[in-house]
């Protein structure tokens, strides 16, 4: 069955604590991951929290990559969602997990848009 998108949710544990709290490293890693996966980067926004932790998003033409890091737990919550078949989200997730030096990871891929994609809209989209 065809899907409109692929959404990978990654739970990364036992990550490098310093890297989880380094906004420049996280930002660069996520942009690299998007490019390596074949995506076109549109916007990049990352925000540090006090006393530690980072949340951020890389908006790609094909959807997005996000992170919420919890250095105090050695944990990062990662989402990589891609539309179409040009981008491989698994490449992005692997790059991120390797860069963060995660020794324990759980990954789940969710096919998106498998529902009634041929349904008629209730309203016309302008």
Curated annotation (Swiss-Prot):
Cofactor(s) this protein requires: pyruvate
Cofactor note: Binds 1 pyruvoyl group covalently per subunit.
Pathway the protein acts in: Amine and polyamine biosynthesis; S-adenosylmethioninamine biosynthesis; S-adenosylmethioninamine from S-adenosyl-L-methionine: step 1/1
Pfam families: AdoMet_dc
Active site (catalytic residues): 63 (schiff-base intermediate with substrate), 68 (proton acceptor), 83 (proton donor)
PTMs per UniProt: Is synthesized initially as an inactive proenzyme. Formation of the active enzyme involves a self-maturation process in which the active site pyruvoyl group is generated from an internal serine residue via an autocatalytic post-translational modification. Two non-identical subunits are generated from the proenzyme in this reaction, and the pyruvate is formed at the N-terminus of the alpha chain, which is derived from the carboxyl end of the proenzyme.
Keyword NADP belongs to the record: no
Residues that bear Pyruvic acid (Ser): 63
Gene3D superfamilies recorded: 3.30.160.750, S-adenosylmethionine decarboxylase domain (3.30.360.110)
Site (Cleavage (non-hydrolytic)): 62-63
GO terms for cellular component: cytosol
Keyword S-adenosyl-L-methionine on entry: yes
Role this protein plays: Catalyzes the decarboxylation of S-adenosylmethionine to S-adenosylmethioninamine (dcAdoMet), the propylamine donor required for the synthesis of the polyamines spermine and spermidine from the diamine putrescine.
Family (UniProt): Belongs to the prokaryotic AdoMetDC family. Type 1 subfamily.
PANTHER family: S-ADENOSYLMETHIONINE DECARBOXYLASE PROENZYME
Protein name: S-adenosylmethionine decarboxylase proenzyme
């Amino acid at each position: 069955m065809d899907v409109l998108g692929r959404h990978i949710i990654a739970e990364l544990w036992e990550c490098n604590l310093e890297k989880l709290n380094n906004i420049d490293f996280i930002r660069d890693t996520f942009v690299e991951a998007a490019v390596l996966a074949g995506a076109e980067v549109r916007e990049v926004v990352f925000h540090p929290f006090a006393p530690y932790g980072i949340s951020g998003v890389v908006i790609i033409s094909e959807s997005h990559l996000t992170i919420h890091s919890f250095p105090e737990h050695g944990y990062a919550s990662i989402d990589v969602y891609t539309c179409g078949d040009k981008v491989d989200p698994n490449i992005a997730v692997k790059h991120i997990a390797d860069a963060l030096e995660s020794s324990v990871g759980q990954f789940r891929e969710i096919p998106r848009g498998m529902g009634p994609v041929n349904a008629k809209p209730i309203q016309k989209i302008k």
